Regions:
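Predominantly soluble domains enriched in secretory-pathway, periplasmic, or organellar proteins
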Residues: 5, 13-317
Length: 317
């Protein structure tokens, strides 16, 4: 069902104004803080916080379009997707189902996908208009992440109460299959060419490697306790997985599917993002209220940056 965009509250206009003032000095890391209702903006050149921005009552999922023109936030309390034009211009809020979480955008910036937990669905939004164009029911219960493949053909969907990753054909706007993995799949990442997907399964402490052509898991990589966040290096040679209980990030060599380094970070590391050149990894530490900065070449932590309460993840542009 199509929903017309609605006017944003004053707090969102404050957020837009602040982002407008800083957008020209990119790259910035944007960190949604679920409990404090803010987005922390980090200058990645200096590793310092430059703003704490109001962002609704419960911001969780976050994505930014490849051109850096729009920031997308799921507000779980308002059941809405907030879209902010960067560096300035129109803003809008699109109603969603109950408890939206993970947000993803296609590489061409045309489509936005949001995993909606209590609806057991993935909502597709037209990025240009803000209109809802599809609401796709998935098999997994409480979907958390919905991630586009690099070519935008597929969406992989992880759900907290599942042992599979659901596969959506974006053109058909429906689920067309599923890949068996371990209990509670969470973070999802793709190799640069989209041939391989990596899925962290929290309750089995394992990263599953999926061949997208056959839609089958072809390898299992032991990770730390409560593996959850996943990000793939731009060169495709390494994958990073956060381990919530251990308070670590593991670096996986994709040539051998083995762990090549384990890096201590903060408490309950969650979702992560790499700088465009892949030189730095930013890790949201949900229980430390901080972001850890990792030097990917040296596989070592460089800094911990204080943010808001219960940071959910990071995007960088």
């Amino acid at each position: 069902m199509w929903h017309a965009p609605r006017t944003l509250p004053a707090a969102a206009w404050t957020l837009l104004a602040a982002l407008t003032a800083t957008a020209s000095a990119a790259p910035f890391a944007y960190v949604p803080n679920e409990k404090s209702g803010t987005v922390t903006v980090i200058d990645t050149a200096r590793q310092v916080v430059v703003r704490q921005l109001p962002a609704g009552k419960r911001p969780r999922g976050i994505a930014i379009d490849p051109a850096g023109r729009r920031l997308y936030l799921s507000d779980a309390a308002a059941n809405a997707l907030v879209t902010l034009e960067l560096p300035g211009g129109a803003s809008r809020s699109t109603p969603l189902g109950k408890s939206p979480e993970g947000v993803s955008v296609t590489r061409d910036g045309k489509l936005v996908a949001i995993a909606v937990e209590e609806s057991n669905s993935v909502t597709l939004i037209d990025a240009a208009t803000g209109a809802q164009i599809a609401d796709i029911t998935v098999a997994g219960k409480n979907p958390e992440h919905a991630v586009f493949s690099p070519d935008g053909r597929w969406l992989l969907v992880s759900a907290e109460e599942a042992e599979q990753v659901d596969v959506i054909d974006v053109a058909q706007k429906k689920q067309v299959g599923a890949v068996a993995v371990g209990l509670r799949p969470r973070g999802i990442g793709f190799s640069p060419n989209g041939a391989i997907a990596y899925v962290a399964c929290e309750l089995v402490n394992t990263v599953f490697v999926i061949d997208m052509e056959s839609r089958k898991a072809i390898a299992r990589i032991p990770a730390g306790k409560n593996a959850n966040g996943i990000v793939v290096h731009p060169d495709g040679k390494h994958v990073y997985v956060s381990n919530g209980v251990d308070g670590t990030v593991m670096m996986i060599d994709t040539a051998t599917n083995t762990v090549s380094a384990t890096i201590p970070v903060g408490k309950r590391p969650w979702n992560m993002a790499l700088t465009p050149d892949g030189a730095r990894l930013y890790v949201a530490n949900g229980r430390s209220n901080s972001v850890s900065v990792i030097d990917t070449l040296g596989a070592r932590k460089l800094a911990d940056i204080n943010v808001g309460e219960l940071p959910w993840g990071v995007v960088i542009q």
